[in-house]
Amino acid sequence: MSDKTNDDKTLSVNTKKTLTMKRPGVEQSTVRQNFSHGRTKAVVVETKKRKFSRPDEKPEVEAAAPKPAAPAPAAPAPAASTPAPAQAAQPAQAAPVVRAPAPATPAPKPAAPAAPVTKPHVAQQRPAQQRPGGQQAQRPRPSDRSGMVLNTLSRSEMDARRRALEEAQVREVEERARAVEEAKRRAEEDARRAKEREESARRQAEEEARLKAEADARRKAEEEAAKRMPQPEARTERRDDARPAPQGNRPQQAGRPQGNRPPQGGRPQQGGPRPAAPSLADAAPIPGKPLPQSQLRKTVASDDDDRRGGGLTAARRGAPAKPEVRAPKVVKTEDDRRRGKLTISSNLEDEGRSRSLSAMRRRQEKFKRSQMQETREKISREVTIPETITLQELAQRMTERSVDIIKYLMKQGQMMKPGDVIDADMAQLIAEEFGHTVKRVAESDVEEGIFGVADNEAALVSRPPVVTIMGHVDHGKTSLLDAIRHANVVSGEAGGITQHIGAYQVEQNGQKITFIDTPGHAAFTAMRARGAQATDIAILVVAADDSVMPQTIESINHAKAAGVPIIVAINKIDKPAADPQKVRTALLQHDVFVESMGGEVLDVEVSAKNKLNLDKLLEAILLQAEILDLKADPSRTAEGVVVEAQLDRGRGSVATVLVQTGTLHPGDILVAGSEWGRVRALVNDRGEHVKEAGPAMPVEVLGLQGTPQAGDRFAVVANEAKAREIAEYRQRLARDKAVARQSGARGSLEQMMNQLQVSGTKEFPLVIKGDVQGSIEAITNALDKLGTDEVRARIVHSGAGGITESDVSLAEASNAAIIGFNVRANKQARDAADQQGIEIRYYNIIYDLIDDVKAAMSGLLSPERRETFLGNAEILEVFNITKVGKVAGCRVTEGKVERGAGVRLIRDNVVIHEGKLKTLKRFKDEVSEVPAGQECGMAFENYDDIRAGDVIEAFRVEHVSRTL
């Protein structure tokens, strides 16, 4: 493209040359576009020619900078030695030498740019001076060559062209400098890669030598085996010959020709002996020069031969297998491996992608195993299978892939995922199918070895007897124990009755006796049962003036169920109405035969108030213990039973335990029921801290994580992990039982709604907090017995300890009342209860608690409907009165009729209507009642179908409140 002035003179340095910027290898042409309304536009279209270079061609770097032509006579100013823009387009193909541009003669006009220089073709390498005539060929005009339309350039366009040429010159200088730096960097990179190739070749040579030594040793062993077994010798040799040569980028072994591979299949060699394979250093590709097509064809052919197993083919045909000559591959360095981004520049590089050494080694080992028919030996393991297990965990325990297990299940017709849970039976089938042995375990196995450990017979020593005092309420059990202990426990009990189970230890004639005091109230049945189970001897206290009572009979049954001997203590013999012989006779009805009546049960007449015959009672206890021959092993870990448990504000969870065997020390890790903890302190019945608790010794244990249930067994375990595992298992078991019990009682939502509609049962929600677990259990059992078909008490929450804010929140959510038994609420709980309107009631006697709850539950009962007969009246005549309706003229035949009473209309001895009287008149006056023998007028509410001869029955309905 060129521009002209108005006088058709070209603006350029040389008046004979047009100012152009022609791109090398690009042809330009003009295309005219047609638009609507007869408009047209000429568009310049550039066509880029692709030049394909042959391997024997020289690159165009040598002809990149031709000498400038001699100036023409008509133009004395020499052409500026401006570098061609086309030369800047190929800096990456080669590293040309940077030539300093010749100083150009300043142009007479500052706005005139330098003369354009076009890229010479390959045929233009000959100097222009050799053309015939000794003159340069006249260049065709641009307009003649391309047929473009010449337009006039403005001054701004000429300035833009000039600035573009100057920027092109600056860019060319910068690109040449960058090319020099790139060439230097590539040289350093090539040197580093060559060093790495040498190191890799050295390692491969060492690996080849090691493999060769192993192959020689294996071959010698096979030859020796073949000598001993002559028959399979031929097969062994054929297998050795058929084994392929190692593959990969390994250097050729010394002593072997690298290029003289014998022809396969008897084919003659073409082209004589093949040249030796180039070394790794020589095989490095030249930057900017593509790999020759012949070398590419050889490389591809060798790869195809490897894939087709050419070594095996040659071995089968009888030719000795020799390693093939493969085109060396460039080993990737660590930086190249880490550079995972695929770019155009990296993809166009001649360095091919190659496998790592580890991948090649694994590939060779796998190929060798496949050739030698070596299979990995199946390892059979003992797999521990719990009750439930996931497929993923089962696969890990068998060291199998979960995919293989899923495939096996799919063959069996079951679609499962690795996270699915299966039972122990299915897991056992899968493990046995995969060749493993199975060991079945259950969650309850965590408790194995805790209880029932056999004692060492040589370490057994005598232990004190454990005695439980049982009997009816107010028969003097606690008073008798106080007299023995020289203490006063009765004064500390609310209401003078025992509501806790207590354990004490006394000493008589140098021998210790452990006493367990149980409540006698009917609500404490479970306490008496626990006391009988944890004892050796049961003392049955019977008042001489009261004889045998219901709780006395219950205590006898508990002792017989526990299988413990009974000693009868006939108390209160100091009273005038005492009759010990009556007590002995009454005990005969319950199979208790005392010695004085010809039986084997010891009986002692005592008086706790006057302390009479207490020594005889203790002697009887020691005699019975001597007969039982009680022994225990104090050197083993401690086991026992929880007598009582409570939550103390200052000390936390406190459990009163009875050590049955072993010795308990501070610091031992204890598991009691679903709670565990480390023993922080041991306190005896006198409040003293002790260093150990031996067999048959009651102590208070501090340090448990929670409050256990009374009656739970405890044991000492080895570590905290074992204790935590046992406690979690028991908590989960208790939670599952509670859920099953609730779901079984409630059923589904529809069943619950139907049950409520049919039965109409009302609930009285309660939150119960007590001082000890035994009292809470007794209160819960007593409240359950109060329930009927219409109303029952629902225990929302129960626990040992004081009343807290969480209890108030729970009571608010469930609309329940809070009951505190021997506990109080803290200030925050009281404030929250006042704010929310929650009632808190405190009790210290179980009688009062049960009576109040019973009265409150009675208020929920629907009142009883009572019907009282008043009288009958006969309808004599029916009158129709305006604005009133039908009025019956009646005579009272029996009793009386009251206004507002309920009435029934009887016709032919059938009740056809039941309602109320609207009006009752005698003559024209309203009256309250009409006695028998008098006449009156009656009208019914919302009913007019009355006839003469019908009978009206009057009655009164009363609602009477009920109690439980």
Curated annotation (Swiss-Prot):
Which residue intervals make up region (G1)? Answer: 471-478
Q: Which PROSITE patterns match?
A: G_TR_2 (PS51722), IF2 (PS01176)
Q: Where is the composition biased (Pro residues)?
A: 103-113
Query: Carries keyword Nucleotide-binding?
Result: yes
Where is region (G2) located? Answer: 496-500
Query: Can you name a GO cellular component term?
Result: cytosol
**The entry's keywords:** Cytoplasm, GTP-binding, Initiation factor, Nucleotide-binding, Protein biosynthesis
Comp. bias intervals (Low complexity): 77-102, 114-140, 250-278
**Annotated Basic and acidic residues bias:** 1-10, 156-227, 234-243, 323-338
Q: Its function?
A: One of the essential components for the initiation of protein synthesis. Protects formylmethionyl-tRNA from spontaneous hydrolysis and promotes its binding to the 30S ribosomal subunits. Also involved in the hydrolysis of GTP during the formation of the 70S ribosomal complex.
| Family to which the UniProt record says this protein belongs | Belongs to the TRAFAC class translation factor GTPase superfamily. Classic translation factor GTPase family. IF-2 subfamily.
Stated name of the protein: Translation initiation factor IF-2
Q: Where does GTP bind?
A: 471-478, 517-521, 571-574
Q: Name one Pfam family in it.
A: IF-2
Name of the encoding gene: infB
Q: Where is this region: G3?
A: 517-520
Q: Which organism was this protein described from?
A: Brucella anthropi (strain ATCC 49188 / DSM 6882 / CCUG 24695 / JCM 21032 / LMG 3331 / NBRC 15819 / NCTC 12168 / Alc 37)
Q: Which residues form the tr-type G domain?
A: 462-629
Give TM regions: none
Which HAMAP family does the record associate with it? IF_2_B (MF_00100_B)
Q: List where Polar residues composition bias occurs.
A: 27-37
